[in-house]
């Protein structure tokens, strides 16, 4: 009867293949204020302010704890318009390089971190040309002094 029926025509089996979804690769862009990181016109490790060290420690911790995979981190140094183009280009590069070295010392693999500079070529302000007082001008141009951090990887641990 029924036993022979199952023997001749076996009950169908369903094979379910479990596929783990691939987490999307995302790029997160952060702007770190150079004024929070460095003394005015500074770019070296010795020029890092206490708050700047805290900010970079938090960034390194965030990268290490939030990302299961880091494909690349690109740092871009920016300056305000004060000073020559050549000087600002160099200053932006030195700031980005200092941030790279700091993150590397905090466990971020050196080979995933690259850096470049835009100098004064990508301001966030309108240049603050109407501001004449030197101290007020430095304050007005503050948003232009920054390091942009572009993190590309997979979030989630």
Question: Predicted regions span which residues?
Answer:
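Periplasmic peptidoglycan-binding/tethering modules of Gram-negative envelope proteins
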Residues: 1-72, 136-138, 152-157
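Periplasmic OmpA/Pal-like peptidoglycan-binding modules at the C-termini of bacterial envelope proteins
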Residues: 97, 104-157
């Amino acid at each position: 009867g029924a036993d022979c029926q199952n023997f001749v025509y076996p009950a169908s089996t369903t094979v379910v293949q479990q596929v783990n979804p691939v987490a999307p690769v995302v790029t997160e862009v952060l702007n770190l204020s150079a004024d929070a990181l460095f003394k005015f016109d500074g770019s070296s490790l010795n020029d890092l302010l206490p708050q700047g060290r805290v900010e970079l420690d938090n960034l390194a911790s965030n990268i290490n704890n939030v990302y299961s995979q880091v494909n690349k981190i690109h740092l871009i140094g920016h300056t305000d318009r004060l000073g020559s183009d050549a000087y600002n280009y160099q200053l932006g590069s030195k700031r980005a390089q200092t941030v790279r070295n700091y993150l590397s010392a905090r466990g971020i693999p050196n080979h995933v971190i690259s850096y470049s500079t835009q100098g004064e070529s990508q301001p966030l302000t309108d240049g603050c040309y109407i501001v004449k007082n030197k101290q007020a001008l430095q304050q007005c141009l503050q948003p232009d002094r920054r390091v942009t951090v572009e993190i590309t990887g997979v979030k989630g641990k």
